[in-house]
Amino acid sequence: VSKINDTGIIFDIKDDKLVSLVSSLDSTLILHSEYKSDFQFNTSLNIPDVKKLRHVLDTIEEESLEIDINSNNLEYSGNGVKFKYHLYEEGFITKPNINLEKINGFKFDVEFNLNKATIQRLFKGSTFASETNKIYFYTDGESLMGELTDRARHNTDNFTLSLGKADFKLEPIALNLDNLRLLSLLNDEIRVKINTEYGVVVFDIEENNIKLRYIISALTQ
C-alpha cells in the first residue's frame, strides 16, 4: 500500500478482513487490498502515515502481536517495545472515488498470466529503452508481446519481449511503466485482465491470505 500512497489511508476491518483502497497521486492506479485473518470486530482505522507505522512495526520481532485499538490511537506494549500511534478522526480522510462493483462487473476481453521473472526481465529492458516510460501489450500472431517504446515519438529506442503464447488477439494497449513498478510481486503468478472498451487493465495477485487487485488506466497511444 505504501508504495502507491503512504499518507491518509483508511483500513476497514470487517468480516474477518482488513481492507484498503488507495490510489496514486494522478489516479491512474488504484489498489484494492484484502488481508484475511481472525478479526473478531469491525472498525475503521484512519492511518495518517502508513510508512511511519510500518517502520515502528518492523521493530517488533514477534511473529504475531496484539495491538490495542483505542478511540484515537493504536497502542502496543510487549517484548521490550512500547509505542502509541495516533489516528486521524473519522471523516478526515476520503477514499478514492472509484466504483469497484462496476469494475468487478466488467466483461474482460482478454485474460492472461504473467510470471514474476518475465516482469523483472521487462524492467531490465527498461534500462535500454530509457527514453520512454510506456509499455505496450499486444499480440503478434500467436505470441503475446510487451514493448517498451513511445509510438507517439520518432527515433525512440525500443525493447520488445515475448511474454508467452496467446490464443487471443490484442491490439496495442499502453500503460505507464511506473505503475507496473508499483506492483507487489508477492506471488510468482499474476493474472492480467483487460477491458478494451474502457481502457482498464487489472492485475490480480494472491498469496495465502492476501489478495491484491491493481486497477490501471490505459494511456493514449
Regions found by a protein language model. Give the residues of each.
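DNA polymerase processivity clamps
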Residues: 1-86, 107-221
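Long, charge-dense
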Residues: 90-109
